[in-house]
């Protein structure tokens, strides 16, 4: 699938995307380089316009995922007591609406990313791992909660990142 087609398809509803494939599956695509700079610039402008037109289901990162220092300090103190090897539902209280199925889905996804990072990063000590977990939670709060990203039955939220990417940013995209 080419860049232009992918750009168009991610904005289809879940129902419309089922028509492309036998079942709906989230899309995770990466493109490295392009043969046509003009097409790339057109697609990037289209993506930016789509994100601006759909702020409740979209977030766009341009070259980095900034970390809000104030939130990091606020959450840092609250999260000092968590077990960074396994997050519980009570550890993320208030991240999503009370009773929302998203809370458990987020905890499951966060634990998946923590396990993945533990296997690949070999954190030298517990504090470094805990800071990694805090960063994932602060980023989620900053870009999902504060932007009021909607999760509903018909439209899947979109997350677009372009530019050089760090390992932690990759883990965050996996988490989403």
PLM segments and residue spans:
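Active-site and donor-binding regions of nucleotide-sugar-utilizing enzymes
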Residues: 108, 118-175
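Ligand-binding pocket scaffold of soluble enzyme catalytic domains
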Residues: 16
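Conserved N-terminal ligand/cofactor-binding loop architecture of enzyme catalytic domains
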Residues: 1-12, 20-137
């Amino acid at each position: 699938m080419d860049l232009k087609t992918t750009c168009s398809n991610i904005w289809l509803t879940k129902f419309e995307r089922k028509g492309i494939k036998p079942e709906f599956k989230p899309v995770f695509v990466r493109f490295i380089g392009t043969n046509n700079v003009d097409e790339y610039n057109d697609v990037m402008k289209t993506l930016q316009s789509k994100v601006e037109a759909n702020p409740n289901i979209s977030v766009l990162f341009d070259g980095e995922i900034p970390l809000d220092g104030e939130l990091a300090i606020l959450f840092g103190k609250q999260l000092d007591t968590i077990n960074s090897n396994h997050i519980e539902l009570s550890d993320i209280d208030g991240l999503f609406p009370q009773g929302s199925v998203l809370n458990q889905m987020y905890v499951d996804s966060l634990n998946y990313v923590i396990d993945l990072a533990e296997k690949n990063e070999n954190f030298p000590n517990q504090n470094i791992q805990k800071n990694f977990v805090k960063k994932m939670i602060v980023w989620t709060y900053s870009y999902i909660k504060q932007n009021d990203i909607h999760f509903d039955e018909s439209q899947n939220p979109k997350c677009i990142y372009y530019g050089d990417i760090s390992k932690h940013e990759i883990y965050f995209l996996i988490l989403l």
